[in-house]
Regions:
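Non-catalytic interaction-recognition regions
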Residues: 1-104, 110-580
Length: 580
């Protein structure tokens, strides 16, 4: 299989560095992390630029420009390279031959949906826990962004050679599921014909529990209508959590998301996993019995200094040690969470948690726990996802009374579609808050990134029929040497895709794929639009069949790259639009 230009250049650079090591200019065994090969901001500086000389010079104590000159001299001898220059403190700027860019189109045509794929993950197992919404109701837009970010990140890591486990942690052991069970009990009594008026204060008010109450009434009749809570709480809790998880799975399916594993908090506790984690940590003197400092500020008269099992999280950078049990001996949420990460780490080389930004205050303690539980041998990342503000034509969306004062994810998908939702969730960094405006996300405007990227793909798809109408057949591989400068500029943008994929995977930032696609689509549209004023610039121009075949080959390659990027985002490409 043909190799992408990005992979070839990296291989060339590695060989050149190897030659310098053999020559004694660079010591063997140096850590090459931090070496980059990127497109410079100014095209006048070349097609590619590498910081290799500066990184290696810092490690070896040599002068970066001297090392850059040696690198440049060897890189200049490579077949794909037209010119090499040293700039600034030691950047090596590379200009590639037109033939190299033309060949990249053939690589895209050969690799198809594998173009951009990378082996950098080397088969490492990554556990990504995402969504993990409390099983107390259907999913809403507050859950949506983390779901899409987590799933797109999983796609990205799988595409770059990682083995990925998509995991959902079910918080089914806390007080909120008891409240859920009591809420379902009230709906159960309503289903039996009782008139209870408004939902009691503190219970979940959404109508989504009515079907659960009806199912319970059908199964149990009036057996638990007036029974003491101890008789029915556990039963109603299990039944209602199961019903809510089924709803959540259905909501996720609407987004095109399915998890490989569901882990239950209640099952962890029942299996004694927190006890196992505590014992393991005590053996290493990372849990001790101690008394916490009194709360800062005015201390409640009810506060008492009580000895509790404390995890030494300050040893790992936290601002205080954390209790893993409550005064009554039951587990704190952190205590169970600690055990959960202990279990996850058993069959994964890396752990990633996708959390809502409202959990920012607990990140440090979990990072500390993960470092302790893996003895610092496994990478652990927490990615925080900021809120999504729902608007309609610039005005805040009123909440849904039926859903319990929130807008359900299912309602949003029904209105605008899965692909619009998924794409929009990736148009900003996860750490930045975003607006989702029902009016603008479906606009046929270049200011709408969803439309602009999909429109580029639809235009490319339309070329097949336009070419046929003009009597243009692709036939044998075209003469790509007929592609001019503007066309090769578009090739250069598309050829960045493998590097962008690797960089996005390394940074754990799937939004970079959306950014790349927006840029690629913009350059494609710009080239397309030149044909409006000058018919000779059109992709399908029957008066010059050889050039048209080359341009159509280019367009097909661009369409392939767009599809590959959309696939990583979990978005289906649009093949036809009225404006195409």
């Amino acid at each position: 299989m043909a190799v992408s230009l990005h992979a070839r250049i990296l291989d060339h650079l590695a060989r050149v560095i190897g030659d310098l090591q053999v020559a004694g200019d660079v010591p063997a065994g140096l850590d090459r992390a931090g070496l980059t090969v990127e497109r410079p901001h100014d095209p006048a500086h070349g097609d590619l630029s590498t910081n290799a000389a500066m990184v290696l010079a810092k490690l070896t104590g040599t002068h970066p420009r001297q090392l850059a000159e040696k690198l440049a001299g060897r890189l200049a001898m490579l077949e794909d390279v037209a010119d090499v220059a040293v700039a600034g403190p030691g950047f090596v700027n590379i200009r590639l031959t037109d033939q190299a860019w033309q060949n990249e189109l053939a690589v895209i045509a050969d690799q198809k949906d594998r173009y951009g794929m990378s082996p950098v993950g080397a088969g490492k197992t990554v556990n990504i826990e995402f969504v993990s919404a409390n099983p107390t109701g259907p999913m809403h837009m507050g859950h949506c962004r983390g779901a899409v970010v987590g799933d797109a990140l999983a796609n990205l890591l799988a595409f770059t050679g990682h083995r990925v486990i998509r995991e959902y942690y079910i918080n089914d052991a806390g007080g909120q599921v008891d409240i859920l069970a009591r809420s379902a009990h009230q709906r159960y009594r309503e289903a039996l014909g009782e008139s209870l008026g408004e939902i009691a204060e503190g219970l979940y008010p959404g109508d989504y529990l009515k079907p659960v109450g009806e199912a319970l009434a059908a199964d149990f009749g009036g057996r638990y209508a007036d029974a003491p809570e101890t008789d029915w709480l556990a039963i109603f809790r299990a039944r209602t959590v199961a019903a809510m998880m089924e709803t959540i799975r259905e909501d996720l399916a609407l987004l095109g998301i399915s998890h490989d594993r569901f882990a239950s908090e209640a099952d962890l506790v029942a299996a004694g996993k927190p006890d196992d984690a505590e014992a393991w940590l005590r053996e290493r003197d990372l849990v001790y019995d101690g008394v916490l400092e009194p709360p800062k500020g005015e201390v409640s008269k009810d506060w008492e200094p009580i000895a509790l099992p404390l995890f030494r999280s300050t040893k790992f950078g936290d601002d205080q040690d954390r209790p893993i049990r409550k005064p009554d001996g039951s587990w704190t949420y952190f205590g169970v969470d600690l055990a959960y990460h202990f279990e996850k780490a058993r069959d994964a080389d890396e752990l990633i948690d996708i959390w809502g930004a409202d959990h920012a205050g607990t990140v440090m303690r979990i990072v500390a726990a993960a470092e302790a539980l893996t003895e610092g041998r496994k990478r652990f990342d927490v990615k925080l996802v900021q809120i999504v503000r729902l608007l309609r034509a610039g005005e805040p969306v009123k909440m849904s009374k039926r859903a319990g004062n929130f807008v359900t994810l299912a309602d949003v998908i029904r209105e605008v579609g899965k692909d619009v939702v998924r794409f929009m969730m990736l148009t900003r960094k996860a750490e930045a808050s975003m607006d989702f405006d029902f009016a603008t996300v479906v606009e046929a405007s270049k200011d709408n990134p969803v439309f602009y990227v999909q429109y580029a793909h639809a235009r490319i798809c339309s070329l097949a029929s336009r070419a046929a109408e003009a009597g243009i057949e692709l036939g044998d591989p075209p003469d790509l040497a007929l592609l001019d400068g503007p066309s090769l500029t578009l090739v250069k943008r598309a050829a960045e895709f493998p590097r962008i994929v690797e960089a996005a995977a390394a940074a754990r930032e799937p939004h970079r794929i959306a950014f790349f696609l927006e840029g690629l689509a913009a350059e494609f549209h710009a080239l397309w639009n030149t044909g409006n004023a000058d018919p000779t610039r059109r992709f399908a121009y029957p008066e010059n069949l050889p050039v048209s075949r080359a341009r159509l080959f280019l367009a097909v390659a661009i369409g392939q790259v767009i599809r590959n990027g959309l696939a990583l985002m979990g978005v289906e490409p649009t093949h036809e639009m009225e404006r195409a």
